Amino acid sequence: MAGGLGIKDVIVTFTTYYPYAEYRLINIHRAALWMDGTIVQPGEIFSYNKAVGERTEARGFVPGIMIDNGVFKKDLGGGVSQVATTTWNAAWFSGLELVQHKPHSFYISRYPAGRESTVAWPNVDVKFKNNSGHPIFVDTSFTKSSVTVSIYGTKFVYVERDIAPKTKFIEH
């Protein structure tokens, strides 16, 4: 995997699930493949957009449904936010320093509440900093209905989550 870098632990593995659509399958798999094997040195910042690159036909992406300012539309790379959300959650539970993410403009029930993320080339990104003191390795895998992001390195913290009940937000 990343021999010689001192990578010895699975820091975290996170999986999200999605309903089948051909475009979604292609774009999610393409994004995961571009990101797979990324090594982030201590102090470096991982950027989803840098790892995955621009979503173009030449890079293997196809048109699909995406959300743009709260409206569904068809564009290249539709569905890649699934990988962004999975990556954000892996970073969240790894204890790495969270740098940048942007939630969708409305809640999507298949994503973890409060921990979903969208991306758009080149500025809307998912970023985290390797503050572990050791190199980390980003590994991806996928099926027809799920995508998994695992982060390997040297475990340095333990992260726990607690879910509070949903409440209505009232603006004053």
Regions from the PLM with identified roles:
Residues 1-172:
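Well-ordered beta-sheet/strand-loop patches within structured domains
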